[in-house]
Amino acid sequence: MSSGYDEPLDPEECLRLLASRSVARLAFASTAGDVLVLPVSYRVDDSCVLVFATSGSGVLARLAHGERVSVQVDDVSEELHNGWSVLAHGHATAYKGDVSPQAWIAGHDEVVIGIELDRLTGRAVSAFG
């Protein structure tokens, strides 16, 4: 049996993988100072902005006023013991672009938020080479 690998992914590959998915975990600081991690459905526009929609009264709506956030997306095969993970960091603001994200819940599309990504890191791992 050959040994596995744990390799960093370059930013271009991270962006490609991020764009290949539609659900991520969004992390940000709550008004109480706790770190919240919530799932969001998203799309990536042509200028590398991650875009999602939310209700006007939800906890995510305040991100439209400018917040530092992190987004994590992955694909893991427990059966094959391999996968990848991408972590993106950026600044969230109200989005004015052309991408229309698909909200999963009716009425949760009142506020559209874009995250201008300024740092992308990722890793690919496998138990077997």
Feature names for model-found ranges:
Residues 41-78:
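A short mixed-secondary-structure module that forms the rim of ligand-binding clefts
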Residues 7-12, 53-58, 96:
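Charged, amphipathic alpha-helical segments
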